[in-house]
Amino acid sequence: DEYVGLKMKRPFVEKGTPFDLDVIGVDLDGKSVPGVPIEVKASRLDFEYKHGHYKETRVDPQTCAVTAAADPVPCRFATDKGGEYEVVATIVDAKGRANQTKLTFWVSGGDTPPSRDVKQERVQLIPDKKEYAGGETAELLVQAPFYPAEGLVTWRRSGIVKTERISLTSATTTVKVPVTDGMVPNIAVQVDIVGMAART
């Protein structure tokens, strides 16, 4: 009857920047369970081409072994390569029953498997925060379905507020922009890219 919780400080980091998260063990009532061991594993998600299809694999495993405490306990993972990482935390109660929690985070500079079809593909945007106020700097991770590519970032609120041209030499890049009072609330961001994509 014990559960493990994970909280990340931000959903992505630059390649080479350690990824930090907090780990906590609780019971059914949400109360902390100090002294219980928790194992946290992180793996990078990679894609292996076999029999005409790309298959997701987990590589470069890292382990952070902690002991639950009254307050959240920190874990840190290296990010030597870009891409998507999966974190799995496991806690085992006194009866030997395991409970797991999973989350994913992104590291700039990773690749995605190419598509077999020629179609309009989506650019994925991941903000570093859910909300921004005037005076802050917004940071967006741009995940492109192909590269190299040229892109245009457009910020809209009752018309176009700002545009920025970007060049992608990898599948991900980071865009930073200072948030002014005129951009809030409810600003929209759009990224359009053009380039070439490999086909299998």
Model-found features: residue ranges?
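A structural signal for beta-strand and strand-to-loop patches characteristic of beta-rich domains
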Residues: 1-200
